[in-house]
Amino acid sequence: MTARLRTARSTGMLLLALLAAACTRTGAGPAAPAATPAASATAPAGAVATGAYPDLFAEAGYARAEVEAKIQVAFQQLFHGDQAQQAVYYEDGSNEHGPLAYIHDVNSGDVRSEGMSYGMMIAVQLDRKAEFDAIWNWAVTHMYQDDPAHPAYGYFAWSVRTDGVPIDEMPAPDGEEYFITALYFAAERWGEGDGRYDYRAQAERLLADILHRQPITGMTARGQMTAVNLFDHQAKMVRFTPDLANAAHTDASYHLPAFYEVWARVGPQADRAFWREAALVSRDYFARAAHPRTALTPDYGNFDGTPWAAPWRPESADFRYDAWRSAMNWSVDWSWWALDPRQVEMSNRLQAFFEAQGMADYQSLYTLDGKPLGGGQTTGLVATNAVASLAADHPRRLAFVRALWEQPVPSGQHRYYDGMLYLMALLHCSGDFRAWLPEHADDGN
């Protein structure tokens, strides 16, 4: 707060200094991409600064008791409901470290780092330490690569069988991002444990590896492979994957500037400047990747914001299952930190597009310019579109919140992805998805 006030008071001096620098600068190189717009002195402070996380359900007219009951019903069904049709959380015995449990992608028949990290984030937000620890124990036991000679060393296999046998040993970086942030939040909520339950130490080890791990060439189930770190140092951007063949690409839904701001406050001091800049880069990336009319982003992208049609999946240039989460990511960033007003306009643009498609009829898959590609209406997209209301400021925003409220808790064959996004959206829209930070955390300025 002090730094912000100091900045506001010295605006005139800063402008003079910048003008002088501009007048003396010569031999400039190519123009850099437009920087994230600076927040004005009258811009609203984010929820992390104020402690007031928006309760969109209250704005839409729902009583707090109803909201809390709805969240608990969803949690109990998805974590402790009927295992044949409702649950995605499965207890799996115990080992020397304690109970084990996994989040099951029922439709695909595997366990994914994405879902495991989502499960941990949900658990820490709801103060469910037992479930958090059991998921983390399973992930470290069955998914973490601890062989220094393996290209995935220091990361988690993104897909394994329910018995822990890897399907793909390489990581999907969004899993690591959610693991790290959930571990930091756990350290703040519950304090430090021992061994693998020393949450802060575990988070910092992972955070160091995703940024600093050196290239490793070695054998995998798919043959010899070379893999690097999960963040490109030059682009300051999360990679699609660390294997060299695809490391120069990204995935819009892996961009989590709200989390990078957390890391810039509680992570290793030497890397905090990098994470602050990574947050700025991701905000600029969203502004470039979002279609100018629809605000839809592709599943996979190039570092310059253009879509990437992966050779094995050319439809990745469209708005598909991964891309549902992009608006959720930039809207949470606005809600928590309120540093980029472009996010308000992008959420307004996105919701205007879906409203025009028909609130009850919009599909799940589109070209970036808005041509429907089918998929029907799914709870997962309804959920992420509701979270976009954290940034949107048009009155239509509450229609998307009410649409989420009317959705039943996902069950059946597709309950994993829909269910995880649904429960996280309930937490976001109720003000119960929070950044758990120590009071003395660096303010990031």
Language model region names:
Residues 181-192, 253-258:
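Hydrophobic alpha-helical segments with transmembrane-like composition
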Residues 48-176, 182, 192, 347, ...:
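N-terminal carbohydrate-binding/catalytic regions of secreted carbohydrate-active enzymes
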Residues 21-22:
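C-terminal motif of bacterial Sec signal peptides marking the signal peptidase cleavage site
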Residues 363-445:
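C-terminal functional modules
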Residues 136, 183, 200, 207, ...:
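Inward-facing hydrophobic residues that define packing positions of alpha-helical scaffold repeats
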Residues 29-44:
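Ser/Thr-rich, Proline-interspersed low-complexity disordered segments
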Residues 43-73, 77, 84-87, 109-113, ...:
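Extended ligand-binding clefts on enzyme/binding-domain cores
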Residues 2-13:
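Bacterial N-terminal signal peptides that target proteins for export
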